[in-house]
């Protein structure tokens, strides 16, 4: 799954700075959301990265502290603040303190960075992680359950996902113990 700490690996986020919420860097990011005003509760489901840009900043009732409280109460993942002359110019200490208290990551990035690049890269990263997770569970579930696997299909899927199937691999063995007798279970019966 894509997490807040992974944001800093994206090329579009190369100039982003983590400001607060270091203990929340493992928060999952399911999607991104860019509100137009302070009334966005019904538009989020949790685990979104909140992108604070011009529409919400210029809204008549904009209040960064209230926005942060709302994001935390809605179980959002973190917050990306666009900063600069026409965006957020200062970030008060009470904002950073509150985010730290709630392990809520806050990042800042210049408002001059095209948002389309950030949205696109995050979307691709989330989709790739989801696809890889499904692929991993499918391949390994079939192996563990002893289901027949087409070797050519298996090799192709591993190559698509960057697995080096020619290198030494690790195998695990399960030893099943019957709870009633504390003896190893006989798998033939």
Regions found by a protein language model. Name each.
Residues 1-171, 178, 182-189:
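Alpha-helical/coil-rich non-catalytic "connector" segments in signaling and regulatory proteins
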């Amino acid at each position: 799954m894509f997490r807040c700490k992974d944001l800093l690996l994206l090329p579009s986020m190369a100039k982003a700075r983590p400001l607060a919420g270091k203990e929340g860097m493992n928060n999952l990011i399911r999607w991104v959301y860019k509100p137009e005003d302070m009334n966005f509760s019904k538009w989020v489901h949790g685990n979104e990265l909140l992108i604070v840009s011009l529409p919400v900043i210029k809204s008549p009732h904009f209040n960064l502290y209230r926005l942060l409280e709302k994001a935390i109460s809605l179980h959002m993942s973190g917050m990306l603040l666009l900063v600069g002359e026409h965006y957020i110019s200062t970030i008060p200490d009470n904002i950073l303190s509150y985010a730290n208290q709630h392990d809520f990551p806050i990042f800042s990035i210049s408002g001059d960075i095209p948002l389309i690049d950030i949205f696109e890269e995050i979307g691709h990263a989330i989709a790739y992680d989801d696809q890889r997770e499904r692929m991993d569970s499918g391949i390994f579930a079939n192996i563990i359950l002893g289901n027949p696997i087409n070797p050519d299909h298996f090799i192709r899927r591993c190559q698509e996902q960057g697995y080096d199937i020619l290198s030494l691999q690790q195998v695990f063995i399960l030893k099943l113990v019957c709870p009633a007798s504390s003896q190893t279970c006989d798998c033939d019966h």
